[in-house]
Amino acid sequence: MGAPACALALCVAVAIVAGASSESLGTEQRVVGRAAEVPGPEPGQQEQLVFGSGDAVELSCPPPGGGPMGPTVWVKDGTGLVPSERVLVGPQRLQVLNASHEDSGAYSCRQRLTQRVLCHFSVRVTDAPSSGDDEDGEDEAEDTGVDTGAPYWTRPERMDKKLLAVPAANTVRFRCPAAGNPTPSISWLKNGREFRGEHRIGGIKLRHQQWSLVMESVVPSDRGNYTCVVENKFGSIRQTYTLDVLERSPHRPILQAGLPANQTAVLGSDVEFHCKVYSDAQPHIQWLKHVEVNGSKVGPDGTPYVTVLKTAGANTTDKELEVLSLHNVTFEDAGEYTCLAGNSIGFSHHSAWLVVLPAEEELVEADEAGSVYAGILSYGVGFFLFILVVAAVTLCRLRSPPKKGLGSPTVHKISRFPLKRQVSLESNASMSSNTPLVRIARLSSGEGPTLANVSELELPADPKWELSRARLTLGKPLGEGCFGQVVMAEAIGIDKDRAAKPVTVAVKMLKDDATDKDLSDLVSEMEMMKMIGKHKNIINLLGACTQGGPLYVLVEYAAKGNLREFLRARRPPGLDYSFDTCKPPEEQLTFKDLVSCAYQVARGMEYLASQKCIHRDLAARNVLVTEDNVMKIADFGLARDVHNLDYYKKTTNGRLPVKWMAPEALFDRVYTHQSDVWSFGVLLWEIFTLGGSPYPGIPVEELFKLLKEGHRMDKPANCTHDLYMIMRECWHAAPSQRPTFKQLVEDLDRVLTVTSTDEYLDLSAPFEQYSPGGQDTPSSSSSGDDSVFAHDLLPPAPPSSGGSRT
């Protein structure tokens, strides 16, 4: 035993010498935090730390100089700390969870053998402000014993997360905990500019004691860079955070797969069904049990008979509603149970079965009797499945086409693209159940995510729409669309009456760097146009080239471009509001021409509504004009991912799509035919201002506030009172009170009938100011004569030409 004892004594001596020698080594500055751990202060120096009530106090004390430091003990106010559920003691780290005033005091980390102090901290736990009101922070300015100096961060490890992404409507808090002597001040910048409460709808909360900025109910316009500036007379420091606000998903509730799960219970036991619901909009949850009425589980209309077991009450929470508890189950409790969850978009449901078994002693007898039958049944089912597999393989071989020649390209990847169906049905409809699928085989030697160099795509041929590539001659580019480029072309065989005569068409095709999603979207748009059918006032599908090369989608060509530029090009010449003073003016428009434009667009939207299609982006820029001045609505078949569209930022040419959106679409992402009617009212305003920009000079943040307060745009100069009343009805705050497109067609037809053909526009009337760059000029939001707003929420009297609403 002599040798082991000597070795143990030698180890202890080495540890003591190493601890003593470490006193002479330099140390780095220590940082307190929940995540990062860095060296602590030099022995003898006391670190002053301030924590909020309820925070986790975490003290870190690495070995000085990085060497060994042996066993340690943590001491508070001279008394050793005893580990507990709230006090977590480690060799180099101490955590005190849910801190309170009693946890304030002097903490130190000491070597157990020598009692040498390795790190020393002074901790003070303060109350967080009880409300969001601004605090003056004077109680933070007392002398803390720290030497006079520039500001510094006290909790830098809590500031590591510089990018914050949160869903809309959440509360965001940025913190910059700092100290200095004298106590520094803190100010906030957004995108490099001073940020105050009046700069944001809903305001902000500045909690100086917490060195924090709080924003409640964030919206996408709150995106940006937020910088805290902490300074005193000796210096300043700053930290920048980036905030990204994620759009609310316009989707019916999503239920977690596999829940509720089937249950098997013994008579008299307790059972719980669980249903996990995910929904951005507030969900409503119910638990249902399927029952029989007169021996039938469904009614004459196919609706199942159910009993509501659990639903929302005054004091129930969503978490409570996600669990259905059944106590002391009986045989009558066996059956099908459904979790039904709904929101403003639609409904989702999952079902599960409960099987109730007799008591355990009865089960033993049943098992013995049933084991023989189970064995026979399993062998029989296995043999039957084997026969089915053999028959299926044989049938597939007989029906399979002959293999391609050696010169044919190899199919490297087959993708099954779910096509986003733009025919948006009523809010309770299941979009997924009606989603068409098109099987697409990519023929290429590449395996990358793009479709570059793809010479051929295998799409199922549709004889009704397929056009031979030999009959198509591509021409000049017309522009770039969502999925690729659009070119002019001449097609032979489009007009069945004159099959040999070439017809000018527009061809949509993918760009060279297109992705699989771009292909899916273009195919989706094509399929949507097939389903919606033809109408004079929409852009119609003419054909497609899907075989033997790139995908080409042929649509009608509109020679005069979009309605917005069509109107601007026909503004009276010689004035500063004309679209292009260097270009000869086009034909002058009469008042009846403008009413005709509106009437035709209403006709097109009436047809789309009858086909259950919601446009979601109706504006003059999405209406095209043919050579014969026929209005055609475009882009109604686009597979828009509406919760990813950034409607809160300017587009490249300065337009703000929020200005066409109904309040329920803008704030809640609810799109209906009624929200399209609101957009139609804005389009009417565009028409009668000859392509004016809605709400000129109004910042987006102020627009939100003004719309909520009921402000609406004033009557355009070249618009009658009756037409303005139609606009105002389209802008009713309640979607159900807005006219339908069928009613709008009737109203505009009535106005068109009584309008004189020779009634030209008043050239002396002022138009909305427009600059080719699309930048809005600053203007007042007051309600004066030049304001673009009117204050009354509803018109004082119904339009004389509008008729009654039903």
Swiss-Prot record:
Disulfide bonds join 61-109, 176-228, 275-339. Its EC number is 2.7.10.1. Residues 472-761 form the Protein kinase domain. It catalyses: L-tyrosyl-[protein] + ATP = O-phospho-L-tyrosyl-[protein] + ADP + H(+). Autophosphorylated. Binding of FGF family members together with heparan sulfate proteoglycan or heparin promotes receptor dimerization and autophosphorylation on tyrosine residues. Autophosphorylation occurs in trans between the two FGFR molecules present in the dimer. Phosphorylation at Tyr-724 is essential for stimulation of cell proliferation and activation of PIK3R1, STAT1 and MAP kinase signaling. Phosphorylation at Tyr-760 is required for interaction with PIK3R1 and PLCG1. Ubiquitinated. Is rapidly ubiquitinated after ligand binding and autophosphorylation, leading to receptor internalization and degradation. Subject to both proteasomal and lysosomal degradation. Residues 132-145 have a biased composition (Acidic residues). Residues 24-126, 151-244, 253-355 form the Ig-like C2-type domain. The chain crosses the membrane at residues 376-396. Keywords: Apoptosis, ATP-binding, Cell membrane, Chromosomal rearrangement, Craniosynostosis, Cytoplasmic vesicle, Deafness, Disease variant, Disulfide bond, Dwarfism, Ectodermal dysplasia, Endoplasmic reticulum, Glycoprotein, Immunoglobulin domain, Kinase, Lacrimo-auriculo-dento-digital syndrome, Membrane, Nucleotide-binding, Phosphoprotein, Receptor, Repeat, Secreted, Signal, Transferase, Transmembrane, Transmembrane helix, Tyrosine-protein kinase, Ubl conjugation. Changing residue 760 to F: Minor effect on kinase activity. Monomer. Homodimer after ligand binding. Interacts with FGF1, FGF2, FGF4, FGF6; FGF8, FGF9, FGF10, FGF17, FGF18, FGF19, FGF20 and FGF23 (in vitro). Interacts with KLB. Affinity for fibroblast growth factors (FGFs) is increased by heparan sulfate glycosaminoglycans that function as coreceptors. Likewise, KLB increases the affinity for FGF19 and FGF21. Interacts with PIK3R1, PLCG1, SOCS1 and SOCS3. Isoform 3 forms disulfide-linked dimers. This is Fibroblast growth factor receptor 3. It comes from Homo sapiens (Human). The lineage of its organism: Eukaryota, Metazoa, Chordata, Craniata, Vertebrata. The gene is FGFR3.
